[in-house]
């Protein structure tokens, strides 16, 4: 039996939330020559959510802030090691980024460092594409820190 969402009173969200600017941006030093870019948007008192981008090699862009209601969520966005605004960037000719440190388990540890640095007890973990794999690995190793797990475009 197929039931249209309109029959259930469900209106699908087809538009993203309006563009917003971060209220906090920082570089988090990981102690191994890597720094990751971290930003917070939305409601500082809202439900914490971390957005894990695809790639590897993704990052950047303002669209990732727009998946969440900025009135309800404290939106944490990072650029994973070597991506976006994080340094050193893997695609930069001026640097010799050490790819040996760019492992799944280091990325999982990076997420946990961000959570701790921001003073967050638990958060929703939202991953897309490669970020869905990273989200699963994080949730498996830090279940006490994950309130919900959302995976999209599963890689």
PLM regions: where:
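Conserved HGGG/HGGXW glycine-rich cap/lid loop of the alpha/beta-hydrolase fold
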Residues: 30-90
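Short glycine/proline- and charge-enriched loop/turn segments
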Residues: 91-97
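N-terminal cap/lid segment of alpha/beta-hydrolase-fold proteins
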Residues: 12-40
């Amino acid at each position: 039996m197929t039931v249209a969402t309109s029959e259930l009173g469900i209106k699908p969200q087809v538009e993203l939330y309006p563009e917003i600017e971060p209220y906090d941006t920082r570089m988090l030093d990981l102690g191994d020559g890597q720094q990751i870019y971290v930003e917070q948007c939305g409601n500082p008192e809202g439900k914490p959510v971390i957005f894990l981008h695809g790639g590897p090699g993704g990052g950047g862009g303002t669209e990732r802030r727009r998946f969440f209601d900025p009135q309800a969520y404290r939106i944490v966005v990072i650029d994973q090691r070597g991506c976006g605004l994080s340094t050193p960037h893997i695609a930069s000719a001026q640097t010799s980024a050490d790819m040996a440190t760019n492992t799944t388990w280091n990325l999982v540890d990076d997420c946990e460092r961000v959570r701790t640095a921001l003073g967050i007890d638990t958060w929703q973990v939202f991953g897309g594409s490669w970020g869905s794999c990273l989200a699963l690995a994080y949730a498996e190793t830090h279940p006490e820190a994950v309130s919900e797990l959302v995976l999209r475009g599963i890689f």
